């Protein structure tokens, strides 16, 4: 099957930064493994699945982890590589539980993961041989990170439909090589458990709609606090990839109250859909995984307006 067929019937989805510190925080005080496990255990996947169905989301994307070194799924390969005990990977496999709750609702599950080691965890950075913010080859790190990703991909199999990989800021230094590790081997690790998994590699805000390599399926599309209107130039550079836009409904990633009026949210969503694109809105969640009421109301309005 052509992976582009996986986008059929998909219009918009939601994203959540499920983390122990605010999104993007590389220095904040992390929680203990027990505190992290308590947070993961408190997530009611059935409640969220029902609310996602109610508001009409076609897919849901959640962070496996980011900078602190806490991940919401077990990974023995990661634990062996970094040697941290007790593990900062959760005992509960939240990703597997989410997938099981979403599938009966007809909602796909995507996952987010950085392309680098957790920068706020010094031991993980050292053991994985990661150098943050440098345009280096880092071949040894890449091999280790591919092994970590492969373990998760095989664990979840076809239940995870898409991946959004953050922080691919140095493609020419790290990935654009004919010999492995490269984008091809990176994508192969991601698709080890599901050859049809959709993949995007995020190069940052500078050119969010420029595909990085042949092994991507959609644009990373991170646009932050601005809402661009993709024009003819963007359509010409897609190279057969799906146009995708990622922004947040709150004040920033995963925080604050809704910043837009309902009409703007619906209008911009319609604009992207009219260009055969898809749009992902980031929102915060309550500690139990529920959509906060202000966002739930706005998303219900979005669903109604899209049907008008």
What is each stretch, according to the model?
Residues 1-308:
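Mature catalytic domains of secreted/periplasmic carbohydrate-active enzymes
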């Amino acid at each position: 099957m052509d992976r582009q067929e996986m986008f059929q019937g998909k219009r918009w989805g939601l994203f959540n930064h499920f983390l122990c510190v605010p999104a993007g925080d590389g220095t904040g005080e992390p929680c203990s493994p027990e505190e992290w496990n308590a947070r993961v255990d408190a997530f009611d996947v059935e409640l969220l699945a029902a609310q996602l169905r109610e508001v009409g989301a076609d897919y849901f994307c959640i962070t496996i982890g980011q900078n602190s070194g806490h991940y919401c799924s077990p990974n023995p390969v990661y634990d062996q590589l970094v040697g941290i005990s007790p593990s900062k990977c959760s005992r509960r496999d939240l990703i597997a539980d989410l997938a099981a709750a979403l599938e009966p609702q007809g909602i796909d599950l995507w996952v987010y993961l950085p392309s680098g080691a957790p920068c706020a965890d010094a031991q993980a950075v050292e053991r994985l041989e990661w150098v943050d913010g440098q345009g280096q080859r880092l071949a040894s790190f890449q091999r280790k990170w591919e092994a970590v990703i492969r373990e998760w991909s095989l664990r979840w199999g076809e239940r995870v439909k898409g991946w959004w990989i953050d922080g691919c800021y140095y493609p020419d230094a790290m990935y654009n090589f004919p010999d492995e590790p490269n984008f091809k081997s990176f994508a192969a690790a991601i698709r080890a458990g599901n050859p049809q998994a959709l993949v995007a590699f995020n190069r940052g805000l500078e050119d969010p709609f420029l595909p990085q390599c042949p092994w991507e399926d959609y644009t990373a599309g991170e646009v932050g606090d601005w809402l661009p209107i993709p024009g003819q130039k963007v359509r010409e550079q897609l190279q057969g990839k799906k146009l995708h836009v990622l922004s947040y409904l709150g004040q920033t990633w995963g925080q604050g109250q809704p910043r837009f009026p309902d009409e703007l949210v619906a209008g911009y969503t319609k604009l992207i859909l009219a260009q055969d694109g898809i749009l992902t809105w980031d929102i915060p969640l309550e500690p139990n995984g529920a959509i906060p009421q202000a966002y739930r109301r706005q998303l219900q309005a979005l669903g109604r307006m899209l049907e008008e």
